[in-house]
Design a protein with these regions (language model features):
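Phosphate-ester processing/binding pockets and catalytic centers
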Residues: 1-281
């Protein structure tokens, strides 16, 4: 989105407030059949645990480089498989993405602009998931901080627009002011949570695009699918999935058949009952 706001701060949330860090990335802006947005969710209070996990993996597998889907190869596959395994074993992390088929997008609803369409879909992903989180835990004071890798857009302050629109939508639903406290641009090279989001989103999108590349990537895609109990990543999930959620933005009025089949998730490492119960509210 060409975002410029980078003055993030590490100050803790107010006492009694649970802050979520939502690390975001995009994929498929190069004219491919689908584009998508991913979001990795983590409690702000677990930042230290996440950093320690990444440091341990880097040292164990001697991988000091940027975490990124396009960096996956035979030489570093063990690191990326361990990273994925750690994600699925870590209950406080969750991945939610939105996939849009370009052929289903009616640009007359977006002033003829792909930039605007993508911005709306990105904001829709965030507001939908934040709404579900606020609804699941109505007794809890929550706020949401969003980190985005610079996303392609002709508009230089798109992060601020996302923040304004998201808060407007959420205020109408919940009467709360500034559920999204800020949206910041973060360099993915220095932000492993965005890197992990990029890896998970890249695996989903490459499968949907039918864009097989390196054998290592194919193996990592299957590794992720195995942790979901799926034959492949060529599926979307039911809306209540918490750990790994693929939202296919399908428009049945467009006349085209669904691109994929919805598949129940059977996690290799099941979530605690309390987390699963909250997802069904």
């Amino acid at each position: 989105m060409g975002t410029k706001r980078t003055d993030d701060d590490d100050s803790p949330p107010p006492p009694g407030v649970k802050r979520w860090i939502i690390s975001c990335d995009e994929s498929g802006t190069g004219g491919k059949p689908f584009y998508g947005f991913g979001s990795l969710w983590s409690p702000d209070q677990r930042r230290g645990d996440f950093a320690a996990m990444i440091t341990d993996l880097r040292e164990r597998y001697r991988y000091p480089y940027e975490i990124k889907w396009n960096k996956v190869n035979d030489a570093n596959l063990k690191f990326y498989k361990a990273l994925v395994e750690s994600f699925f074993k870590t209950n406080y992390l969750a991945f939610h993405c939105l996939v849009v088929r370009m052929a289903d997008v009616d640009l007359t609803h977006h002033s003829g602009s792909w930039d605007l369409a993508r911005q709306k879909h990105f904001t829709r992903l965030l507001t939908n998931k934040i709404q579900r989180c606020l609804t699941a835990y109505p007794e809890r004071a929550q706020t949401f901080r969003i980190w985005v890798d610079p996303i392609q857009s002709s508009y230089g302050k798109a992060d601020e627009v996302v923040e304004i629109i998201a808060n407007h939508v959420l205020k109408k639903l919940f009467g709360q002011v500034r559920s999204v406290d800020r949206v910041f641009t973060r360099d993915s090279k220095d932000t492993p949570s965005i890197g992990l989001c990029d890896v998970l989103l890249g695996a989903v999108m490459e499968t949907w695009q039918k864009d097989s590349q390196r054998e290592a990537k194919v193996e990592l895609r299957q590794w992720i699918a195995d942790h979901l109990g799926w034959p492949s990543l060529n599926h979307d999930t039911h809306k209540n999935e918490v750990k790994f959620n693929v939202w296919y933005f399908y428009d049945p009025t467009a006349g085209a058949p669904r691109a994929v089949k919805t598949e129940p998730v059977k996690l290799k490492y099941p979530l605690p009952q309390t987390v699963r119960r909250a997802s069904n509210r």
